Amino acid sequence: MSFLLTNDQIEQFKVDGFLVVDNLVDEKTIAQLHTRFDRLFQGDFETGIRPDEVNWQEHDSDPELTRQICNAWKSDHCVAATVLREDLGRALAELGGWPGTRIVQDNVLSKPPGARPLGYHQDNAYLAWYTPREMLTCWIALDDTSEDSGTLEFVRGSHRWHGQQTPEGAFHDPPDYKRAMTTAAQQENLIPEVIHVEIPRGGGSFHHGWTWHGSGVNRSHNWRRALVLHGMRSDTQFVPEHLNH
């Protein structure tokens, strides 16, 4: 399948800092990714290459944490075929006004019932190691999502706030997962408008690198899995003195 943005969607993204869409992946791909997610979290890496970051493995990790693997595209052909899709890269470039898109990394995320939150953050805040300091993200829901399932949350218009927060504190299971965002909102003298991404599986969202986002506890009885593509503009250059940060 191929995904195309409309001009109205691009304009809405500029206003809100995020865009919720349907039909990013089909049912066959979802079923394949469910299987591959299980194997990745069991340490079964199809290509023989270990992902760059493995934050959770079966039998060795806290079962109540959200499972995360970064850059599974290096380890699994199905993940690679999804996050390296030309149409998704083109959509990111159109939303960012970029000449093209390069992948920064992917995230394989799996949130079982009862899993704890991921703290609110801004993706661009982590990017001192390249310039221009810009990232756009495509988040693909592999299960039906709801507020109760701990789905992704955005703060509407927060990409236009003046403050840019330095990352601090725990990302996985912080004591108050909204704290950094609410502090930023207070500095802006604004009441944050939080939007929960509630969408059938196969849909997803795009968001700006300065948009505040996070996710709460999965209070449902259902798993909440997602595949995430982070992209940077094609003319990005590295900042050598910051590559180890």
Predicted regions and their residues:
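Active-site region of the double-stranded beta-helix
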Residues: 98-99, 113, 128-129, 140-151, ...
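A short secondary-structure junction signal
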Residues: 116-122, 131, 148-154, 163-167, ...
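Short, structured patches in soluble enzyme cores that scaffold and shape functional sites
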Residues: 107, 122-124, 140-144, 156
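Non-heme Fe(II)-dependent double-stranded beta-helix
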Residues: 2-15, 22-120, 126-129, 242
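A short beta-loop-beta micro-motif enriched in histidine and acidic residues
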Residues: 123-135, 192-193, 199, 222-223
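Short, conserved beta-strand element in jelly-roll/cupin
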Residues: 129-147, 198-199, 230-233
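Double-stranded beta-helix
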Residues: 145-212, 236
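Non-heme Fe(II)/2-oxoglutarate
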Residues: 43-55, 60-61, 164-170, 201-206, ...
